[in-house]
């Protein structure tokens, strides 16, 4: 599922991949990133996607931004789209990844406002690389 943007131009930022490892950004469908990796390894189509990303990310980077959800009730941040890319980014030691975001449960609209870095904790701004105004 791809959410649409409020004004046609989603806000895009970059986040340090270490935020995934530290549990500040969680996988939506799995309890851990290791669990996501194991699941994808066991399924042929998912395994093929991982293999393609292992080959393409070192030379091309992550071209498609991950879509992060921020739960409005408790500010939990999770990957909604991009689990395969996140798993490989962690595995390859990629320093940062592009992302877009939405307020959960409004998955239909990707935000055009800057990411609410406070959702990552008091030092949330330190997890963001640079913020791109609408791309």
Segments the model singles out, each with a brief description of its role:
Residues 1-80, 84-103, 107-119, 131-134:
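Short, charged/polar connector segments at secondary-structure boundaries
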């Amino acid at each position: 599922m791809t959410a649409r943007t409020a004004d046609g131009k989603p806000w895009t930022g970059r986040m340090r991949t270490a935020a995934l490892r530290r549990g500040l950004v969680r996988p939506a469908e799995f309890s851990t990133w290791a669990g996501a990796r194991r699941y994808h390894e066991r399924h042929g189509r998912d395994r093929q996607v991982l293999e393609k990303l292992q080959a393409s990310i070192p030379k091309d980077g992550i071209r498609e931004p991950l879509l992060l959800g921020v739960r409005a009730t408790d500010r939990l941040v999770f990957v909604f789209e991009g689990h395969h890319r996140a798993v490989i980014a962690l595995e390859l030691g990629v320093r940062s990844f592009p992302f877009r975001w939405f307020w959960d449960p409004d998955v239909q609209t990707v935000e055009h406002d800057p990411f609410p870095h406070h959702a990552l904790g008091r030092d949330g701004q330190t997890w963001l690389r640079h913020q791109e105004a609408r791309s």
